[in-house]
């Protein structure tokens, strides 16, 4: 990329900066949840909603981000994304109640939903096609560093300052990024078709209401009748979307996508698989602090091996899938992740803390292999005219399933324990043990879906063709 103009290189730095902000925020909060609960006077069992409110908002807003960028311009939308994300961070730091914090996190989610996809679109527009891969590698590298720094930085700030600082650090960075975007980024626009507002609203209502019903089934004071009503509204909204999208060329997501068998299997497996694996980043630091008595900083440091394992496997995952095939790799990694989850719980409860970094490193390797394989299986056989729509739907499903996973983890903690748990007590460890066993079972279930993937020994080379759009 050395032959690119200076202005283009600065624009790539701005996009990389946005990727870093968004990826850092997805992990920095996890280690702070117990301290947030204590400060806000809430049970730690309710704090999963701090993650869910952000991730669910991202899932809901993702389908609109690309259309908005084409309609209004990439600079305007990227600037708006940074401003909303920064304002959300400020309101998070100022929150005095859990409900205020959840609303502020939702505002952050609106910004986060636009930041990454619009950043990808910007790179596509400002960089020559032959240099696209090199440019994307450059701008996504900070996005890989964010998860590495996030847990430890979050723990450090909580332990030596307060949880408010995990949000306050975004403010000066966001101001600089917003100013740089206005000064340096071009405002590309494109001819757009009419936005499928009806489909967008139906999907948004369906996802939000069903997640709320799932969370409301334990400990929120919702009556059974209210929960049944929420479920009914959510199901009706999704059914109406299917009817709306049938034979509708302007639908948000075409139902023609599901004519491709690998897409249908990959999407179903990704949805189920990320429900299970989405529990782990939330549960691990909470378990280390509340279940085992680790300090926030120590718990954050323990997450680094998992990220390193994940980054290490990205270099060889293509060769692994080409050698063994999607079906074998996905079934093996799904069952393997379930076993590693049990191994983590066992070694932790036995007090073998020196083994935990190695177990978490292994967990990161297995999880990364499964994620990359799920993404590429889902997209690799789609025709070119459906590839963009399929990638957008996969991105939305990824975020939705992660929010559902965190919600289920919170429900399991509430099911097996009381609303008030004490740090490092025998009862609390029993609660976490039952929760961890349930998680391992849920993580293993998608193996039944992946076992239906057809043998594809001659199609695995396609993984490299679609990998770019899936990341």
Curated annotation (Swiss-Prot):
It is a multi-pass membrane protein. The chain crosses the membrane at residues 12-32, 49-69, 77-97, 102-124, 138-158, 165-185, 197-217, 225-245, 263-283, 286-306, 342-362, 396-416, 431-451. InterPro entries: EmrB-like, MFS, MFS_dom, MFS_trans_sf, Multi-R_MdtD. Residues 33-48, 98-101, 159-164, 218-224, 284-285, 363-395, 452-471 are cytoplasmic. Keywords: Cell inner membrane, Cell membrane, Membrane, Transmembrane, Transmembrane helix, Transport. It comes from Escherichia coli O81 (strain ED1a). This is Putative multidrug resistance protein MdtD. The gene is mdtD. GO terms for cellular component: plasma membrane. Its main location: membrane.
């Amino acid at each position: 990329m050395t032959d690119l103009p200076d202005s283009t290189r600065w624009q790539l730095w701005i996009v990389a900066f946005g990727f870093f902000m968004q990826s850092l925020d997805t992990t920095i909060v996890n280690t702070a949840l117990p301290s947030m609960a204590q400060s806000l006077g809430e049970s730690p069992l309710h704090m999963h909603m701090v993650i869910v409110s952000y991730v669910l908002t991202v899932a809901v807003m993702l389908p609109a981000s690309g259309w908005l960028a084409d309609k209004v311009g990439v600079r305007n939308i990227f600037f708006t994304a940074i401003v909303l994300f920064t304002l959300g961070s400020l309101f998070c730091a100022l929150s005095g109640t859990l409900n205020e914090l959840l609303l502020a996190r939702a505002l952050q989610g609106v910004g986060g939903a636009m930041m990454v996809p619009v950043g990808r679109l910007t790179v596509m527009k400002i960089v020559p096609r032959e240099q696209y891969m090199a440019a994307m590698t450059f701008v996504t590298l900070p996005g890989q560093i964010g998860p590495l720094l996030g847990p430890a930085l979050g723990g450090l700030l909580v332990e030596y300052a307060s949880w408010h600082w995990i949000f306050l650090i975004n403010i000066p960075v966001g101001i600089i990024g917003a100013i740089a975007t206005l000064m340096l980024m071009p405002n590309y626009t494109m001819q757009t078709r009419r936005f499928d507002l009806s489909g967008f609203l139906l999907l948004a209502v369906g996802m939000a209401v069903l997640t709320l019903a799932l969370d409301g089934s334990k400990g929120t004071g919702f009556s059974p009748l209210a929960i049944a009503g929420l479920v009914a509204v959510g199901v009706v909204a999704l059914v109406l979307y299917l009817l709306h999208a049938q034979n509708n060329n302007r639908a948000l997501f075409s139902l023609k996508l599901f004519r491709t068998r690998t897409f249908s299997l990959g999407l179903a497996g990704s949805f189920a698989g990320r429900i299970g694996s989405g529990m782990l980043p939330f549960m691990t630091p909470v378990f280390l602090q509340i279940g085992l008595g680790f300090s926030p900083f120590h718990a954050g440091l323990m997450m680094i091996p998992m990220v390193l394992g994940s980054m290490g496997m990205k270099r060889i995952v293509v060769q692994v899938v080409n050698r063994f095939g999607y079906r074998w790799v996905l079934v093996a990694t799904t069952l393997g992740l379930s076993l590693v989850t049990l191994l983590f719980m066992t070694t932790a409860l036995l007090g073998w803390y020196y083994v935990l970094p190695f177990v978490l490193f292994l967990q990161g390797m297995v999880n990364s292999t499964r994620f990359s394989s799920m993404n590429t299986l889902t997209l690799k056989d789609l025709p070119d005219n459906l590839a963009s729509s399929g990638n957008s739907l996969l991105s939305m499903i990824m975020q939705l399933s992660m929010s559902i996973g965190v919600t289920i983890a919170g429900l399991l903690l509430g099911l097996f324990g009381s609303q008030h748990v004490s740090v490092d007590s025998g009862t609390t460890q029993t609660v976490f043990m039952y929760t961890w066993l349930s998680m391992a079972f849920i993580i293993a279930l998608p193996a039944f879906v992946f076992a239906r993937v057809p043998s594809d020994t001659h199609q695995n080379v396609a993984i490299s063709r679609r990998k770019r759009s899936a990341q």
